[in-house]
Amino acid sequence: MAEASQLFKEFKIQSVSEFFRRNAAMLGYTGKVRSLTTLVHEAVTNSLDACEEAGIPPYIRVEIEELGREHYKVVVEDNGPGIPEKYITHVFGKMLAGTKAHRNIQSRGQQGIGISGAVMFAQITSGKATRVITSTGDEIIEAWVKIDVDKNEGKIVKKEKHPNPDGWHGTRIELEVKNVKYMRSKQGVYWYLKLTAIANPHAHIELIEPDGKLIVFPRSSEEVPEPPVEMKPHPKGVLTDDVYRMAKKTKRQSVRRFLIGEFSRISDKKVDELIEYVAALRLIKKVGDKKVQEQLYERLMKGEVKAVLRSFRGYTKVVKQVAKMMEKPPEKLTWHEAEEIVEAFKYMKFLAPPTHGLRPIGEENIEKGLKGILKPEFVTAVTRPPKVYSGGIPFQVEVGLAYGGEIPSGFELLRYANRVPLLFDAGSCVTTQAARSIDWKRYKVDDLDRTPLVLMINVVSVHVPYTGTGKQSIASVDEIYNEIRLAIMDAARRLQTYLSGKHRRLYQVKRKKTFEKYVPEIARALSVLTGESEEKIREYFLNFIESHFASKEAVEVSENA
């Protein structure tokens, strides 16, 4: 039998970077076309977030240069605020690092992996460092960055500084990557940028394809979205570990002040209520009879906490013990006590979390984006009121519907999460499931596969429940599914009204032409019978027909209004 020391001879601690180097597919780097799209997506996402946080209308330029077979140079440049020199290695060379991953805030990226994952993928396929040119308005920093995968750290292998007389600010990154392919497919870079332009009408996006062709998606709105606001965690959406770790880091003087100051919807009065619930749970757990225990838990769930407490002799002593716990320093809160607090939260009723931190695209901007890129004959948008899922995580659903015009025949679903296009794993996405559940025939769409129709769905949240680290599919959460259905049906009813009016107008045009067809013959006959001029009679009937159908159209317009 081998000794333990021999078995553990190969034991090694693996860094986060090393793990993702071996499992790049988890980040979306799987398949040659998808890998290139993922690379561009990570860079463009960073650029959009940076520009918006600085209040700058984004100007983003993407250039794909073919260097050889399945070998490309990818350049992404923006006019954002730039990156301070000391943060360059952290931004581009360290996994799980960023300005938003640790905060309860809406953002396109959530994990702090994105752009550093792109740098790593370029490095492991080409062996080359990523060139970064950036400035905050002072001197221009040019740095070549690599990732030390063993240490999960970025390192600058070469650096130069240049004067900046024009005060340029922004970031340009150049990544050399192999084993990827540029194609104009619906999973490629062109399609990704087109969809990004629809959901971000305030952005000007340019693409230079490998053949040198320049494609421009001009901005159709000058309104830069307000930067998202960090939101305090809601009691219904936290784990014991969250409370325990936050308590160790807080600067508040007592557990009571900590709960009031660092969670939403908790007041002094709510802490007093929490004390009663924690005390009641402590007492219930001491009851030997399981049946009685279950009855007491049920009463607690109904909010009968005072009655439950009064059913125990000497309950005031336990209440005082819990009240004392609330006044001690948070750093002295034990795991068990944090567990008691979180368990009590489950029985308590709280107001829904505030939703002021959510930043939807907005109905007007959705319509601008769809009109500017797709050129439809009809467009409408619906932004649903904010809701919560999993008890305390706020989210919002918005839908855009575009029909006809330059849209080719066939139904197209455009999926988004926080304005970011989701191009892959559509089958497992809640947006696809909700769209498929709609009976489109009820809304005058008889043959969905032949109808020129585009449905856009955007799910907005501080925490989008993705199905995996690749962030290309949203999990099937009941609350989100139901909101998507309601939004689609609202938009579809508007389309139904438009199509009904269109069909009526076509019918009236056909009737009008039929009447006009017989006017010359009637005019000739009446001219013979009455002696009146044939031209005069014909003009009379044509004017009468025109005025008759014009009045019908006016009535129809006023009814629709």
UniProtKB/Swiss-Prot annotation:
The keyword Isomerase applies. GO terms for biological process: DNA topological change. One of its GO terms (molecular function) is DNA topoisomerase type II (double strand cut, ATP-hydrolyzing) activity. Transmembrane segments: none annotated. Coiled coil: none annotated. Its EC number is 5.6.2.2. ATP binds at N46, D78, T99, K100, G109, Q110, Q111, G112, I113, G114, I115, S116, K471. It catalyses: ATP-dependent breakage, passage and rejoining of double-stranded DNA. HAMAP family: Top6B. Relaxes both positive and negative superturns and exhibits a strong decatenase activity. Belongs to the TOP6B family. PANTHER family: DNA TOPOISOMERASE 6 SUBUNIT B. This is Type 2 DNA topoisomerase 6 subunit B. It comes from Thermococcus gammatolerans (strain DSM 15229 / JCM 11827 / EJ3).
